[in-house]
Structure formats: structure tokens, C-alpha cells
Swiss-Prot record:
Pfam families: Queuosine_synth (PF02547). The gene is queA. Transfers and isomerizes the ribose moiety from AdoMet to the 7-aminomethyl group of 7-deazaguanine (preQ1-tRNA) to give epoxyqueuosine (oQ-tRNA). Gene3D superfamilies: QueA-like. One of its GO terms (molecular function) is S-adenosylmethionine:tRNA ribosyltransferase-isomerase activity. It is found in: Cytoplasm. It comes from Streptococcus agalactiae serotype III (strain NEM316). This is S-adenosylmethionine:tRNA ribosyltransferase-isomerase.
Amino acid sequence: MNTNDFDFYLPEELIAQTPLEKRDASKLLVIDHKNKTMTDSHFDHILDELKPGDALVMNNTRVLPARLYGEKPDTHGHIELLLLKNTEGDQWEVLAKPAKRLRVGTKVSFGDGRLIATVTKELEHGGRIVEFSYDGIFLEVLESLGEMPLPPYIHEKLEDRDRYQTVYAKENGSAAAPTAGLHFTKELLEKIETKGVKLVYLTLHVGLGTFRPVSVDNLDEHEMHSEFYQLSKEAADTLNAVKESGGRIVAVGTTSIRTLETIGSKFNGELKADSGWTNIFIKPGYQFKVVDAFSTNFHLPKSTLVMLVSAFAGRDFVLEAYNHAVEERYRFFSFGDAMFVK
């Protein structure tokens, strides 16, 4: 299967630059892959798609303000660091710009010395391992000095950084938001729960690889980035009980899908408490073991996320739905509209 098989025409003006005033005011395209139907709706009508006895599974990761702007104390040269993942203690893997100025031992100062990064190791493609020194609590220092790492296709400044977090964000660690969850309000979640749907949370810390284009033609040669995930025993038990009683596992977003399918693949379709790193690549031909339906945003042409949706609903039907979304002027990507796939 070829990367170009997942290409489609997307006018640049359909890439949403800012979030809508109300989270759940976005449009929702409901696609039923068995009956090959699609219905234009609004996101708050997702309530109609959920049935009593279902479980709605959400990723409660929280985006760190992971973009830091600082300078080298000796030369005052400007340096940008993007935090990717905490390797141990105060050591982080980062993406540095310009990386060539940062050799092992080089220091970078942020916020007039409130935070100092010392390079301990050089990696490829501009990556570095740095060790931070600071007074107080690291996350509090980061909250005051860092900026939200918005995706490369968003050029507008974000006025309210909370709009790039889900309302249920809890576990610090992501370099990008699990954007399918941005549409939910607390009020909508209450209505869903009142309907008899179980709300279940897992964690997958979204890495920057989520924006990395596929650089090979043959999909079998593509290697996915690794991301940390965690599912508690309580969540696993709830989901297994829902399955056993005939309810559906409805995932919110591709990160929830990848976590559930990673664990389901390890334990023959059953869910157990588990944590680790996953680089699962879900593409057409993959047999889903856990997820019965899901919501997701509209993704980039030729991306692994379009491939994942195609694995569930069929490539031709998914591309037909995407072309419909373009014709109907749906908004795309992180701050865009959503689809519900069943």
C-alpha cells in the first residue's frame, strides 16, 4: 500500500486557525461504514450516537507549555527548545533550534536564569538531551516561562492556552493535544453520563511525531514514533464489563484508539492494567480488537491518522467522506470539526 493512496485535495483556507467560541459548536460528520451513509450534524448531537451501556474512552493527558525561548549566556545567541519527553529526573529529550550551536556542556538560560538547560547528549535531527536546573517546582517554572507548542500549520497566536487543553486534562506530559477531545464541555459529558454511558479515562502522552509526515512511499517501511501510555485496572475492568454486557467501546480520538488496540493486541482482545511505550501503526488490513466506534478530527492528507481511520471504515469510503467535508466547508485539523465513525 502506497502513501499516495491516502492523498486528497484540501484548500488551505479550511485549516482552522483558531478554536470556535463554544467547544461543542463544531460540526460533526457521522459516517456509518457498514451502511455507507454519512450525515451532517453538530458535535453536541454526539449524545444521539451514544447508547446506554456504552463506554466513552478519553485521553486525559495534559499538554505542557513545552516551547521555551532562551539564550546562551556567553554569546546571547537565541535558542529555542521544544520539550519532547522526560527521560529521567530533570533530564529531557528536546528539539533544539538552531541545534548546531548546542554541543555537550553548552548552557542555555531562560527567564533571566530562572531555568538553565545544560546539554548532556547530542541526538540526530536536532535532538538533544538536556538537564534542567531551577529553584522550586519544575512544572511551575515551565508554566510561567513556556509557550504552548501549537502545530506547525497553526499560524495565529492562541489567546487562551486552555483552549488547547481538553476540559478533563489531568496527566502532564504531552507535546500536542489529543484534539478529538477538545470538543467536549463539562456539561456535555454530564449529559452523556446521565444517559447511562460510562466515562473512562486512559493516558497517552502525545509526541511531536503526530505531526511528522510519512517520508516513505511504501507503508510497510514506515516506522511510527513511540509514545507513553497507561491504563488503570479500574478502567480496564470497567471496559471489560461493558464489552461482556454488550455495550460498545467508543474511543475519543486516535490516541485513545492506539492505546486500547496496543493493550488489546497484547492480551488477545482483553484489557488489563498496563503501561509502556507504543509505536503501533494501524493501517488498512489491521483487525480491530477493542474499539467499536470513535470520534476524531479531520486529519492531514497522507497522514498515519487518515490511514488509521481508513483501517476501520475503508479507504474509499473515508476519502469519499473527506471530499464531502471539503465540499461542505468543514474545518480541518486541531481546532477544526469532528467526525463520528461507526
